[in-house]
Amino acid sequence: MENTTQLLLRQSDALAGRNVLVVDANDPALKTLSVDATVHVHADDYTIGAQQWAPAPTVPAGTDLLVLPLSKSLDRLRFLLNWLAGEIAEPTELWLIGPTKGGIRGALKYLEAHVDGTMLEDSARHCKLYSGLLQPGEKQSLNAWGTVLEVADQEAVSYPGVFSHGRLDEGSALLLQAMEGHNLGKPGKVIDMGCGAGVISVWLARHGWQVQGVDVSASAVTASTESLARNGLQGRIMGGDLFSPIQGRVDMVVTNPPFHDRRQRTTDITRRLIAEAPTYLKPGGVLWLVANRELPYVQWLDDAFSHVQVASETTRFRVYRAVLS
């Protein structure tokens, strides 16, 4: 359970009888936040299992308390505060909760731009909970918060909260360069795992591959879908936890996997990805993976694949090409 959730559980008296919308939930336990309140949960993260899985929430009628766990991205916080202000017709109580060392103090200036009477309500588990009265604002359009980035002769759409929002990250750039310089063979079926803004999906589709993109983020799924459409390309973009929405086998898996799970650094996601990939690859299928070079992926790749090579590297990143026997 997240520390922020544990702090919220201390607020049982304040939650009793309330109609609560949890926005951008970061913990499945938030679905059972209070037995004495009506709790509706929105999440951008597919793995939360929320009632609403979407880039931005719809505020149910009768909601009298908005609970917002602090995102890692201040752009995401700005977007959500503006969005929520545009979704309410009258001032509504809002709680912002986040780690003391995770940017909660820096987030206050964004909170105070939309909220009256900001107060520190509680502090525990290295987290702080602030409250205030969110004022109604202008109705927002998701598209207005999108950023279009140009990569070579293609375009991609990004939204606040999507990995590397508004720019091409160094790892993905190296991965694209490595694939561009390699004979990938006859285009077939490919999975872009953790598709983000869809830069890699667009590149693959432009080179004739039948693309399936997967991401846990609803914002990323929306962005990748729009990126393909913007370039006049076809592909299927899905929400899911790694390979969960995939049926059948493919010729290639391409990924720039995350090594953070919410705020915690982890290699568990990539370890699962490497272990599960052979189940979804045809014989002779290939996994392309880019990662920070200090991360311990070589042994896991060697355990799962018959041939592993470093296709490209810099002082910070390494691109692996792993072939299934």
Curated annotation (Swiss-Prot):
Which SUPFAM superfamilies does this UniProt record tie to the protein? S-adenosyl-L-methionine-dependent methyltransferases
Is Disulfide bond given among the entry's keywords?
no
Say where the protein is mainly found: cytoplasm
Write the Enzyme Commission number(s) for this entry: 2.1.1.172
Q: Which Pfam families match?
A: MTS, MTS_N
**What PANTHER family is this protein classified in?**
RIBOSOMAL RNA SMALL SUBUNIT METHYLTRANSFERASE C
The record's HAMAP family line, in alphabetical order, gives: 16SrRNA_methyltr_C
**What is the protein's name according to its record?**
Ribosomal RNA small subunit methyltransferase C
Question: In which organism is this protein found?
Answer: Alcanivorax borkumensis (strain ATCC 700651 / DSM 11573 / NCIMB 13689 / SK2)
Q: Which lineage?
A: Bacteria, Pseudomonadati, Pseudomonadota, Gammaproteobacteria, Oceanospirillales
